[in-house]
Design a protein with these regions (language model features):
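Short glycine-/small-residue motifs
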Residues: 124
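Vicinal oxygen chelate
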Residues: 1-6, 29-81, 85-115, 128-140
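Conserved active-site tyrosine of GNAT-family acetyltransferases
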Residues: 18-23, 91, 119
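Conserved beta-strand-loop-alpha-helix junction that forms the acyl-donor binding cleft
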Residues: 12-14, 106-107
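Conserved catalytic core of two-component sensor histidine kinases
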Residues: 9, 16, 85
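Major-groove DNA-recognition helix of helix-turn-helix-type DNA-binding domains
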Residues: 26
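Short, surface-exposed ligand-recognition loops at beta-strand->loop->(often short) alpha-helix junctions
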Residues: 10-13, 80
Length: 140
């Protein structure tokens, strides 16, 4: 298997609410390849998909069982501590739940966490040790 992921799919409890959060709230552009029940958001090398959670579980032949923590977090790497603060303020206004307010962290950066409308955990972090290229991709 090549060292590459192309798509991250988040299961949603309320598909339209989730699409509105990302599309209208955050201003992300939905791909024209999106279809009923599947919203696709190109993120520069990887695509975020939204799909009803129950249907996603059924497709994997699993029974959907809610949990507080799935073991998965998504991360947005900000360019400054101020951007971390600004993003967390923005998503709170959009109805996201702030789980951990922005703060200095043990690894030398600055980060906070929020849950989107379906409870997916998203970190907003500034890491002074990591650089971003001209397309905002991590240089590792």
């Amino acid at each position: 298997m090549r060292q590459k992921l192309n798509l991250i799919t988040l299961g949603t409890d309320n598909f339209e609410r989730s699409v509105n959060f990302y599309e209208k709230g955050l201003g992300w552009k939905r791909s024209s390849e999106s279809v009923d029940g599947l919203a696709l958001f190109p993120l520069g090398g990887i695509t975020l998909a939204l799909h009803p959670r129950q249907e996603l579980a059924e497709d994997a032949t699993l029974q959907y069982k809610p949990t507080e923590f799935s073991g998965l977090t998504l991360s947005y790497n900000a360019k400054s501590e101020k951007e971390v603060d600004d993003v967390l303020k923005e998503v709170k206004v959009l109805g996201a739940v702030i789980i951990k307010p922005a703060q200095k962290v043990f690894w030398g950066g600055y980060s906070g966490y929020f849950k989107d409308p379906d409870g997916h955990l998203i970190e907003v972090a500034y890491n002074p040790f990591w650089k971003l290229d001209e397309n905002d991709n991590l240089i590792l």
